[in-house]
Swiss-Prot record:
InterPro entries, alphabetized: 4Fe4S_Fe-S-bd, 4Fe4S_Fe_S_CS, FTHF_cligase-like_sf, Helical_ferredxn, LUD_dom, LutB, LutB/LldF, LutB_C
Positions with a binding annotation for [4Fe-4S] cluster 2: 323, 366, 369
One GO-annotated biological process of the protein: lactate metabolic process
Domain 4Fe-4S ferredoxin-type: 304-334, 353-382
Keyword Repeat attributed: yes
Residues that, per the record, bind [4Fe-4S] cluster 1: 313, 316, 319, 373
Keyword field: 4Fe-4S, Electron transport, Iron, Iron-sulfur, Metal-binding, Repeat, Transport
The UniProt record lists the keyword Iron: yes
Similarity comment: family membership: Belongs to the LutB/YkgF family.
Protein's name according to its UniProt entry: Lactate utilization protein B
Top-level taxon of the source organism: Bacteria
GO molecular function terms noted in the UniProt entry: 4 iron, 4 sulfur cluster binding; metal ion binding
Native source organism of the sequence: Shouchella clausii (strain KSM-K16) (Alkalihalobacillus clausii)
Amino acid sequence: MAIKISDAPFSKRVEKGLQDGFMRQAVSSAQERLKTSKGSAEKELGNWEEWRTLAEEIRSHTLNHIDFYLHQLSENVEKAGGHVYFAQTAEEANQYIKEIVSSKEAQKVVKSKSMVTEEISMNKALEDIGCEVIETDLGEYILQIDDHDPPSHIVAPALHKNKEQIRDTFKARKGYTKSENPQELTLFAREQLRKEFLSADVGITGCNFAVAESGSISLVTNEGNARLATALPKTHIAVMGMERIVPTWEELDILVSMLCRSAVGQKLTSYVTGLTGPREDGDADGPEEFHLVIVDNGRSNILGTEFQAALHCIRCAACINVCPVYRHVGGHSYGSIYPGPIGAVLTPLLEGYEDHKELPYASSLCAACTDACPVKIPLHELLIKHRRVIAEQKRTARTEALAMKGFGIGASSPMLYKAGTKVVPFLLFPFVKDGAIPKGPGPLKGWTDVRHLPAPAKERFRDWFKARQKEGAHD
C-alpha cells in the first residue's frame, strides 16, 4: 500500500461512498459514540483548553528544534544498544528494512498497526523478497486477509465493514465455522494470530512517540499485539515518521493523555508500552536486536513553511470523528491512507497536488476539525491555504477559473454588478417553482441536484433600502 490507495477519479470515489448505506450508518454511529466519550474524557481531565494549548506548545517547540532532538534520540538509541537509520525516502526505508530481514533469513514478520509503514508500502516491499507479513492489529488483520482492503479510518481501519462481512471473510480465508458474534470473531482471530507471533522471525512496529532524552519508543494500543510483536521475535524494527518525537518523558505523559482521550475517549488505552533498546542481560523477554528507522518521505519539505502545523498531528483521528464530509462519504473517498481533514491537509503535502488537488475542497470549512484537534492544528485554515496555492498554480478546472474571473470582474465594477442584479433574476425566472429553483440550468444543476436553491428575491436589496430611506425622510 502507499499514500494513494485508489486510481479512481475523486468524483467516482465520492459517488461510491454516498451509495454505501451501511458505511454511512456505521460512520455516523461511530462519530456520535466517540464524540460523547471524548467529551466525557475531556471533562474528567478538566481545563481542556489549557491542556490543548500545552500540547500545541510541546509540538511546536519540538518541531522548531527537531534537528537537535533527532540527534539526541539517535545518540541515546545507540547508547542503549540499538541501531538508527535515517531514511530520506520510502525507497531508502524499505531497502534498509529488507536488508535486515534478509540478513536474518526471516520467512515471517509480525507487524503491529503503523500508518507510516503503510505510507511507504513496506508490506509489499517485504513480500517482493518472499517474506510473509502478518498484520496483528485486529482491524488491519481483517483488511489484509480480505484482499488487502485499504483502511478507512486512522484509528479504526475496518470501520467500513460489518460483522457479517467479517464473518464471511474469516470463513472464506481462514475456515471459520462459527457465527457473526463479535466475541467469537475476536477469539478466532486471537487464536490465529497467537500462532503467528510464536513463529515469527522479526517484529515490526510503528512508534507513537520517541523520547529523545532516553532513546526510547512508546507504543499505545488496546489489543496488546504490539507487546507480543516486540517481546517474542528476536529482532524488533520500529518505524517512525521523523516528527513523532518528544523531548522528555514529561512531554510524553501529556501527549499520550491527549491522544487516548481524543482517539477513544479513555484516560489511557489498555497498553502503553515504553521500550529502550534491545534486551539486556537478565531480561525475561524482548528482542536481541533493535533497529529504529526514522522516515522523512517529504516531511522536511513541510518544515519552516506555512503548513508546518500539519506535522503536529498525533494521529488521534479526532478531526475525522467530527467531520461532516467524512460522515457522508467515508474514508476511501479521500483516496489516501490519511482520510478526513488531516488527510486533506497532509496528503497533498507529502505527494503533491497532481493526484490530490480535490482534497482541500472536501470540506465545508465549518472548523469542527480545528476545534476537536488536541494539539490545535488550524486545519480549516490550512485547507484554505491549500486552495490558494492550487488557484495560484492554476490547477483548478478551466471552467471554474473562467467563472471566478468573470465574477471578479463583475463584482469589482459597480455598474456591472448593478446590471447583474437585474439580469440574473430575469434569466432564472423560467426555472422558479414554488419559491425555489428545483432544477437549475447549466452549472447550477450540480448544485440543485443536492441542495435547495431559493428563488431570487422579487425586490433587490438596494431598491428596498432606497425605498426605506425615502420613507424615513418623509416621517
